[in-house]
Amino acid sequence: MTDQADTAMPIQFTDAAAAKVKGLLEEEQNPALKLRVYVTGGGCSGFQYGFTFDEKVNDGDFTIEKQGVLLVVDPMSLQYLVGGEVDYTSGLEGSRFFVKNPNATTTCGCGASFSV
């Protein structure tokens, strides 16, 4: 496990995203949960982002702690997310976690998939 104290932060975790995770964990009443962001093949642009709650941190995972909650990224996904930012938005189109990724050369219209 690598955390922010060991290395420069290759990905950012915004206050808005951390606050939403904190609220969701309070609703679930399970403080062991962490937000995991990952990249998989698929979507209309080749790769897509995924978000899930996970109790485990695996060897090699990168973690960021903010507001008492953890964001976890596996090493394979991290290579596609370096320089990016995990954020949260709520508006007329709904609420969601999303990734601002400077490595993406193209994205689909909804922003859920990308190519590099």
Curated annotation (Swiss-Prot):
Keywords: Iron, Iron-sulfur, Metal-binding
InterPro entries documented for this protein: FeS_biogenesis, FeS_cluster_insertion, FeS_cluster_insertion_CS, FeS_cluster_insertion_RrpA, HesB-like_dom_sf
Keyword tRNA-binding: no
Keyword Iron-sulfur: yes
Cofactor comment: Binds 1 iron-sulfur cluster per subunit.
PROSITE patterns linked: HESB (PS01152)
A single BP term in Gene Ontology: iron-sulfur cluster assembly
Obligatory cofactor(s): iron-sulfur cluster
CC terms in the record's Gene Ontology section: cytosol
SUPFAM superfamilies membership: HesB-like domain
Entry binding sites for iron-sulfur cluster: C44, C108, C110
Source organism, top-level taxon: Bacteria
Family: Belongs to the HesB/IscA family.
Subunit structure: Homodimer.
PANTHER family assigned: IRON-SULFUR CLUSTER ASSEMBLY 2 HOMOLOG, MITOCHONDRIAL
Protein name as it appears in the record: Iron-sulfur cluster insertion protein ErpA
Organism: Shewanella baltica (strain OS155 / ATCC BAA-1091)
